[in-house]
Amino acid sequence: MRSSLLSSEKQTNTLLIAERATRLAPSDPVAHRARAIALTDAGQLDEAIREYERAIALRPGHYSLWVELGRARDQVDDQQGALEAFTEAARHAPYYAQPHWQLGNVLFRMGRREEAFAELRRAALSDMTLLPAAIDLAWAAYDGDARAIDRAFQPQNAPWHLALARFFARHGRPLEALEQFRAADKIPDTERRAFLQDLLAAKHFEESYEVWSGGLETKNTTRAGGIASITDGSFESGIKFDDPGFGWQLTTAASAFRYSLDTVEPKEGAHSLRIDFNGDYNPASPVVSQLVLVERGARYRLHFAARTEELVTGGLPVVVVSDASSSNGRSLAESSPLPQGTSGWQDQTMEFAAGDGTNAVLISFVRRSCGSGPCPIFGRIWLDQFSIDKL
């Protein structure tokens, strides 16, 4: 109650000061604008509109006065009056965002959709931060019609194409998202990765692969089609910790193990992946994983090689193939556990079938659960020669 009274008293004082200013300087548009603002704050919109009109009569070329008049008229549901004011504001400040933004919004509410998006487009050209809200409005207006949205905005530069691409990816339109991404042509790697993560999060794996493979620079990395292709199955292309997509994903969160590329006794090629374990971590967390495209309904055989040295744990490591397309990541196959102690290279194979709705699988190197309590692991493991064949 006290704060409400203080606020009311402050508004009254502000209005009295503004009225005194207009009496002392009746030809000053700033004084009339100040009184119009005070009247608006006091809820006296009709009088505020008249005061804005007085200010504009004294300074007709000032676009911000027209914007404020338009807002005041809009608040009293005078759409035609608001339209006239915002049109004048845009005429006086054709390269400023706000006049076009306000004009576009009032046109939209009047049902003049084509004109509205022309103005919203001009606003976003002046201020890119307005584009996401404009796209949201278009999505609702055109009932998710991506083609109509593209026509409404007529994107002419990479940032606009990319903004539409990311929006479509997040709203279940992967093909249209990919079209916008292609139209953007060369974009910064950080933006490409952000778009890739949008596609991956929405499980648009085939489109994700195109975006990911388009950013590859490693000469030894598989590109062709991506279907049933293990990327760098023998670990010859180096270790990357920050490359989302279809290469090897290595966790940086755990302190209980470390990775290295070992040149001593690889199964094939020049390297194998060595993992040194020294403590406890969540067995369900993948130590290393890779997303692989597959053909829906097809059967596959996965091959890999592993060896161990002084391995001690209650939860032995295994390789698991899971359905990346499903909501629960259901398991499709699991390898035999790697042996305790020390062993030479051992080849393992496992077969699995992709479901009718499965177009990607996740190959993960994890551990079996210890059952209860802490689940430490110590020793060393080497992995090499991952490959996949269609049966």
Language-model features: where?
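Helix-start (N-cap) detector for alpha-helical repeat units in TPR-like alpha-solenoids
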Residues: P29-V30, Y63-S64, Q79, A97-Q98, ...
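Structural marker of alpha-solenoid helical repeat scaffolds
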Residues: L24, L58, H92, S126-D127, ...
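Canonical positions in the second alpha-helix
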Residues: R20-A21, R54-A55, E88-A89, R122-A123, ...
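Hydrophobic alpha-helical transmembrane segments in integral membrane proteins
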Residues: M1-L16, R20
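Extracellular and organelle-lumenal recognition/adhesion modules and their flexible linkers in secreted
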Residues: T129, P155-L391
